[in-house]
Each structure stands twice: as C-alpha cells, then as structure tokens.
From Swiss-Prot:
Keywords, ordered alphabetically: DNA replication, Nucleus
Chief subcellular location: nucleus
Entry GO CC: chromatin; CMG complex; GINS complex; nuclear replication fork
Taxonomy, superkingdom: Eukaryota
Function: The GINS complex plays an essential role in the initiation of DNA replication.
Family statement drawn from the similarity comment of this UniProt entry: Belongs to the GINS3/PSF3 family.
One GO process term, biological-process aspect: mitotic DNA replication initiation
Compartments it resides in: Nucleus
Protein name: DNA replication complex GINS protein psf3
Subunit annotation: Component of the GINS complex which is a heterotetramer of sld5, psf1, psf2 and psf3.
Length: 178
C-alpha cells in the first residue's frame, strides 16, 4: 500500500492496546488529562501507528516505552469463533479493515497459529463471497447478513467477483448491458 492509500491510513488509525513500561511526563493528554504524567503500567488504546512508534525503543536496544498487546479483534474469543465457523463472524464489527489490521499486527507478533486461522478464514469466506457474487439472488435473504459483515478487503473481492460474473454473462449474451 502506498503512503496516500486511504485504506492503509484507516488501518493505521485502528486502536491497539498498549501498556506503558515507563513513567512519561506531560503525556497525560493521551488519557484525556493534559499536563499530567502517564504512570508506568497504564494501559491505553492508541492508534496502531503511534503504538508501533512508541514501541520501537525495544528494537534499538533501549528500554521499551510501551508494550503492544493484541487488539480485541484478534482476541482468543474471536480466534476460537473463526476456528469454529469463520462464515458466522461479523468481521466488519470487529474492525472495518480486519485483514489489513491483522497483517500489520502479525508483523509485530509471532503468532503462527493465528496466521493459519486467518488464512483458513479467508479461504472459507472467499468461497462464500464468490457464491454470493455469482448468484444474483444470493445477496438477498440469508446472505444479506453475511454480506453486511464483510471487511473492506472482502467487499472489494465481492465487487470484483460480481462485476466479472456480470461481464461474463453479458459476453455470453445471457444478460443486457445497463
């Protein structure tokens, strides 16, 4: 993604739980207390980009300012639900850019099992998305709830699959151009 990519900017603005390891003078504005200090052990949800920047000290060999935690969208409860049946999980309510957020977070954490769960989730949901996209009546009825729960990556996939199915029907002479 590029610097000016809106989806990338929105992904980086998603909140990530961070725990301060050191006392930081004058940074209380992050808690809504301007002019106050942030005490060591304070847990605050920060935008992903800021949390990553504040955690960089550990990589440079200095004391870590903050420790990053997994966001609620990737909690054990969500991962277990994805293992059970990924098609029933409303990813959009967890994070509008769920897969982009997952990719960014998994760059920071070593969670091999979660990678496998997310790959399996995408495969199963992509098959369901393709089914709804190729079946014009599939977006109605029981499929409407599923389609409302798609994250942005899945919505783009649905649009491309739907448009290509429509173009194929037009090419085959089964449908008219609008």
């Amino acid at each position: 993604m590029s610097y000016y990519d809106v989806d990338s900017i929105l992904t980086d603005s998603q909140k990530l739980p961070c725990t301060f390891e050191l006392e930081v003078p004058g940074l209380g504005i992050l808690e809504g207390n301007p002019g106050e200090d942030i005490k060591a052990g304070t847990r605050i949800d920060l935008p992903l980009w800021l949390g990553v920047m504040l955690s960089i000290g550990a990589r440079l060999g200095t004391s870590r300012l903050v420790t990053l935690d997994l966001p609620s969208a990737l909690s054990d409860r969500v991962v277990n639900a994805l293992k059970a049946d990924p098609r029933t999980v409303d990813l959009r309510s967890l994070a509008p850019h769920f897969y982009s957020l997952s990719e960014r977070v998994l760059d920071l954490f070593e969670e091999e099992e979660m990678v496998d769960v997310l790959i399996n989730t995408f495969k199963k949901r992509a098959a369901e998305i393709a089914d709804h996209a190729h079946n014009p009546k599939g977006a109605l009825g029981e499929g409407a709830d599923f389609l409302r729960g798609l994250d942005e990556t899945e919505r783009q996939l649905f649009r491309v699959a739907h448009d290509s199915a429509r173009e194929t029907r037009i090419w085959a002479g089964e449908a008219k151009k609008r």
